[in-house]
């Protein structure tokens, strides 16, 4: 009998906002993410540094367990601008692009 393995990635929910307009997060200054999203390491991200923003947006998109997190920490215009550069797990990218096909363009 073969044993099938289920990974955490296979069962972890991917949280997606109902609309991009709901993403009303900050756009200037320093983004301070809470420790329930950033378990260790850097938790402050500078809006003046795209590498910081890419790291912060990836954390929020991958680690959020509640829609309120993506609504609070992501901004629609910033997400649209960064989307082509974001290095996301395939399942996360696919789920967001299914919900918002305009991101794939």
Where do the PLM segments sit?
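Long, compositionally biased intrinsically disordered regulatory segments in eukaryotic proteins
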Residues: 1-105
